[in-house]
């Protein structure tokens, strides 16, 4: 829900406004709105993944900043579901501390990885993209704009910054 309200709503509104200005038909407006919502969710999930993986973004923002904030992201949720009870409790405990201790942050990241939180979050991103694109694709003309939209969406899933 947090993702839907945060980035999902912004992307959805952007797509809706562009579609309304372009004067598209209702079915295309709805598909574009849903696609925008999905892209926003994908963007936020990827941002959460990047925060707990070593990459250019985490070098700028700080690795595990979301852990320090105690953020319950999608990778954390999946990890907690998949970890044994004691390890899930340990992850929850670390998050509740809002600690900047690098060892605790590393331990939390290791637990998220052990619980396959990142892998499952990536599966969700691909599913969101595929479902939204399958609804939108047949409504769009085959042209460079369609290819650019597809490329932008795929970039959001694979971006490293």
Regions found by a protein language model. Give the residues of each.
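All-alpha prenyltransferase/terpene-synthase fold signal
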Residues: 1-161
């Amino acid at each position: 829900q947090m993702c839907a309200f945060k980035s999902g709503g912004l992307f959805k509104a952007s797509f809706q406004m562009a579609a309304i200005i372009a004067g598209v038909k209702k079915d295309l407006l709805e598909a574009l709105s849903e696609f925008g919502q999905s892209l926003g969710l994908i963007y936020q999930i990827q941002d959460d993944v990047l925060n707990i993986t070593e990459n250019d973004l985490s070098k700028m923002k700080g690795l595990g900043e979301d852990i320090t904030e105690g953020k319950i992201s999608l990778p954390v949720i999946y990890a907690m579901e998949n970890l044994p009870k004691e390890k899930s409790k340990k992850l929850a405990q670390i998050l509740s501390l809002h600690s900047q201790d690098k060892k605790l942050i590393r331990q939390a990241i290791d637990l998220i990885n052990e619980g396959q939180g990142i892998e499952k979050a990536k599966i969700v991103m691909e599913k969101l993209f595929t479902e939204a694109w399958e609804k939108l694709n047949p409504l769009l003309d085959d042209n460079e704009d369609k290819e650019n939209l597809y490329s932008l969406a795929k970039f959001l899933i694979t971006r490293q910054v």
